[in-house]
Amino acid sequence: MKLKKIIGDVKYELICGDLNVEIDNLNYDSRKVNEKGLFFCIEGYTSDGHDFIDKAVEKGADVIVCTKVPKKLPNCTVVKVEDGRKAMAVMGANFYDNPSHKLKLIGITGTNGKTTSTYMMKSMLESSGYKVGLIGTIANYIGDKKIESHRTTPESLELQKLFSDMVHDKIDYCVMEVSSHSLYLDRVYGIVFEEGIFTNLTQDHLDFHKTFENYYKAKMILFKNSKRSIINIDDKYGERVFKDAGNDKITYGLTEKADLKAENLKMTSRGTEFDLCYRGLREHVKINIPGKYNVYNALGSVAACLNEGISIEKVKDGLNKLSSVPGRCEIVTHNTNLDFDVVLDYAHTPDGLEKVLKASREFTKGRLISVFGCGGDRDKTKRPIMGEIGSKLSDIAVITSDNPRSENPEEIIKDIVQGIKTDNYVIVENRKEAIKKAMLMAKKDDVIVLAGKGHENYQILGDKTIHFDEKEIVSEFIKELF
């Protein structure tokens, strides 16, 4: 494709070279550039793409798109733009022939609940006969084809490539998690969503956004680019989102003020039944994932599907077909007579930890044992808060490591313990040993909640990433110890 066509309506200044140059690959990583390549110089937080212009040209870049003109011009076309990330998003869309225009997109944002909601919507839409793509934290899907996910919302170039592959495979809908990072960093710039869903807003990512207000403003970008907004009105930020979202709006929740609500909840360890009420409609609904917070996830997902014309029968069928979501309040299954349960959950925020522990308490006949830590090189202010929540809502809390990254695990644990006001906790720094300790402590009818890793099958220790799959570890200990 000619550079001129790729640029499209992006404002630019041609520093040198020719707009008629032929391009067949776009990259922001100089190591991945090939012949006839275009290289975007993106300024990151630890490196600046402008420092890699020479390497990109060596690899075959015929075009450099920059925001700062290099002192020594390379022997290729150089185009200067005002905003590198916005230009990359628009040019990426142009290069792949604007694939998002050929899909119906449903975006979901919020601190917690995004992953489960996308799985619910995928199941409901597929029950109605649609081919559905999914983009999110656990994995990306093009129909049934699973593709590894490296971040919740991909960079704009990878995102447009995914959309293009979905169009090629005749996908009708794409349901996607839209992270605050992706909104702030313009990964979804220029994309229009049929439905934008707000789940909740609680403390997370303040290492990146610095203030809660910045975090809120980043989330709100989704609703400026959605035709309709679906808002959890029970969340403390729900009213504000409702006021700030200027498009067609539907609210959901468990209170009377919600447009779409759930009543008469009956919760067990294997799921929840409730009455769905919406505009004179009352239907009995069953979901196979436990916890009141998953009722909220179901309500937002149902609202989106009803908005899209999916019948209530297909909605119920889709929810019933979804047996579980990996690492989301997932009870580890086994073929033994183990008399306690082990629950895996990705909860890595104060709100997430509180919700999974409260949900687990609902079906715990014995003691509730939690195992959790906090990630290194991330928001430190949430550590003592999680310590307080974990110890207060558990009968026994086992404080351990999560992904320490470059931080000393002992220091992270000290930060967590600062928030603990009780003595019902033990410290076991090694996470595998912490799981073993919890399982050895467990008695009949106890429930162990392993919080923080969920679907992840790795642990980051320093600069090393090791294999660490909690489902495998629990199964291994069941065979070894019981």
From Swiss-Prot:
HAMAP family: MurE. This is UDP-N-acetylmuramoyl-L-alanyl-D-glutamate--2,6-diaminopimelate ligase 1. Its main location: cytoplasm. One of its GO terms (molecular function) is UDP-N-acetylmuramoylalanyl-D-glutamate-2,6-diaminopimelate ligase activity. It holds the Pfam family Mur_ligase. Meso-2,6-diaminopimelate binds at R378, D402, N403, P404, R405, G452, E456. It is found in: Cytoplasm. A motif (Meso-diaminopimelate recognition motif) lies at residues 402-405. It comes from Clostridium acetobutylicum (strain ATCC 824 / DSM 792 / JCM 1419 / IAM 19013 / LMG 5710 / NBRC 13948 / NRRL B-527 / VKM B-1787 / 2291 / W).
